[in-house]
Amino acid sequence: MKNNNSSSVSIENHPWKKKPTTLLLFLSLLSISLLLLRLSQDKIILITTTKTTATTGTDHQRSHKSSEDDTCLGRYIYIHNLPSRFNLEIIKDCKSITRPKDKISMCKYLDNSGFGPLIGGKSSDYSPSWYATNQFMLEVIFHEKMKSYECLTRNSSLASAIYVPYYAGLDFRRHLRRRNVAARDAAGKELVKWLKKQPQWKDMSGKNHFLVTGRISRDFRRNSGSRSAWGTNFMLLSESLNLTFLSIERSLTSHNEFAIPYPTYFHPTSTPEILQWQEKIRLTNRTVLFSFAGAQRPSRNQNGVVRTEVIKQCKSSSKTCRFLDCDVNANSCDDPISLMKLFESSTFCLQPPGDSLTRKSVFDSILAGCIPVFFNQGSAYKQYLWHIPKNSSKYSVYITVKELRTGGKNKIEEILRGIPNERVVGMRENVIRLIPKIVYAKPNRNKPDGEILEDSFDVAVKGVLERIEGIRRNEFKTD
């Protein structure tokens, strides 16, 4: 009994019994501590999740948006991470893509994201956005711009198109004079073999894939096994027929090729810079009626005959036509400033075909506000369907071969002089309006919300997406 009583007294006399508030205080502190611990854990989880989202890229964040909020819906593009032998190793070995006759090493042209050396410092008339850009650098330029494309995704299932950054033109340049056709064709065959093994190929058998070639179509359409035959067979491979090709000149009979402009010398950083240039050339004093910059070509085919006649007529109209003979080294046809000054001083710029139907000069002259004069429908009208208007008479002059050869020694001058001045002014303004769509702006171009000016890259990407969406609707319907 004593022990029980003692025990009973002990419990009753315990401090918690004497002071009930002490127990309540202890329990309150314990609850607060547990709550703080939970909040701390939640914060750690929140921080970790935020960091993970940031490192997965913009595409991951956008994938959680509703379709109404996602401005990239239908515009997502996935870039294949190709083995380096298809791009980086080609330009790393830049000496191999330089030909003996090249006045400047191709290594120099790879500077500044493929834009080449700066030329702005040579003349106050040209801003730091002017470069000595080589006509064959489009593959590198397009790849660099694609890396900054606003709707890239690392999730290929979200992509409306798959970009294949293979430098086909530069690769061909390495093997330009090799008589071993197997060596010339090797990379193209290896590429399609690699593509077919990727899960992205299975979705549409490659019909949602596209790539850019910085050379004309003919260079990839060798249909002979002869060692003396020109080019590679890349575009004729069965898998290649499913791809969409963007080339500086397309085959007019091809169903999967689309021509996009040659790169010019101007690569602006912002819309105001483009507008400023347009205003400058509107006010330019044009003292020459027409001009031609180029070299003589053999008269073995009609293209050579046309060019020979154009040069002859320009020389015979020496008071109204300026001829920059690119066969003469002293004329500096490789100097962008010399060419631009010629085109800026001319009302019309003659664009006869040469080695092929198209010329880089077409876009350099448009950049200068000079009205192009064509002698073949395939030099522009049937080529650049996404970039130039269908109504060709609004911005250019077309002279048929028959008119050229049977109209007398000054037929070109006669036709151009006969165009009313009011029409010339309107044509020039239409040419100037084309400028934003024929230049490749810098990859890091300042493009604020509400930007309405599209550059050549923007127009090309839009065209690719629309084409692939059309194929998806027509050939891959799901009920």
UniProtKB/Swiss-Prot annotation:
Keyword Repeat: no
Protein family (similarity comment): Belongs to the glycosyltransferase 47 family.
Residue intervals passing through the bilayer: 21-40
Spans within the Cytoplasmic topological domain: 1-20
Membrane topology per record: Single-pass type II membrane protein
Species for this entry: Arabidopsis thaliana
Any one GO cellular component localisation term in the record: Golgi membrane
Molecular function per GO: glycosyltransferase activity
Gene this chain is encoded by: GT15
Tissue: Expressed in roots, hypocotyls, cotyledons, leaves, stems and sepals.
Topological region Lumenal: 41-479
Alphabetic keyword roster: Glycoprotein, Glycosyltransferase, Golgi apparatus, Membrane, Signal-anchor, Transferase, Transmembrane, Transmembrane helix
Domain of life assignment: Eukaryota
Carbohydrate attachment residues: 155, 242, 285, 391
Intracellular or extracellular location(s): Golgi apparatus membrane
Pfam family, one: Exostosin_GT47
Enzyme class: transferase
Biological process, per Gene Ontology: protein glycosylation
Protein name per UniProt: Probable xyloglucan galactosyltransferase GT15
Biological role: Functions in xyloglucan synthesis by adding side chains to the xylosylated glucan backbone. Involved in the galactosylation of hemicellulose xyloglucan.
E.C. code: 2.4.1.-
The keyword Zinc-finger belongs to this UniProt entry's keyword annotation: no
